[in-house]
């Protein structure tokens, strides 16, 4: 009642599914009542930005189609972001979550018709898929299949992992001159720089680096997340010990840079390691750099030249 009286809108909504039986399985016995409450709020003019956590065997396939169809009939649901279930090795309920090509393609094939319909009718796709679906569906040709920049509008769902890859690609491609210059600097200084990535970046940034003029000098080093396991593969969730083990043996004459997204505001990774801890454990000097492409390219040049 307070939401309606104060017209607190738009709100964030975890929708997940629409069929009562599926909602009971996923959310609990009282879950069906949530749709009744949602419809009351929608009727009162409250708007929502919705999210669906897609879970294999629960709310994908036909259930996803039903959910999207129902939601599209309610204009108050402004948009929907779909993200895959995340899981670690420290549980036994899930062993996969659209990690393979076929499963990820099935999701894309389910969602694309609704995106095209919404684009034609409303002028924007309305439902957006997390980057993981495209990365998993096109491991060897992601750059050829990634949605264009305009697909993501103002990137409202960036924090949900929707459009991050496209942003990184656009930034990289806008830095062509900067990359040419950095390639010259690295060659002149006879320097090699290893940039740490999570496995999720292999189809995108790792490939871009391998095709850039800095190839062989600015080297992507993809690190597996052994600490969490499962399908946890983004750079921001990398743990210090995994990185330390991955960089052991790198020459002291080379450089290793870590994106600052690995660290919290106090300078710790998720396994409570600092930059100094990573250096001491690996025996290799490491430097933290920005996540923005033009910024970290400039910081790498400063690191190598020494000013």
Task: Give the label of every model feature segment.
Residues 1-75, 86-114:
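Conserved Radical SAM active-site core
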Residues 72, 79-81, 86-307:
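Auxiliary Fe-S-binding modules of radical SAM enzymes
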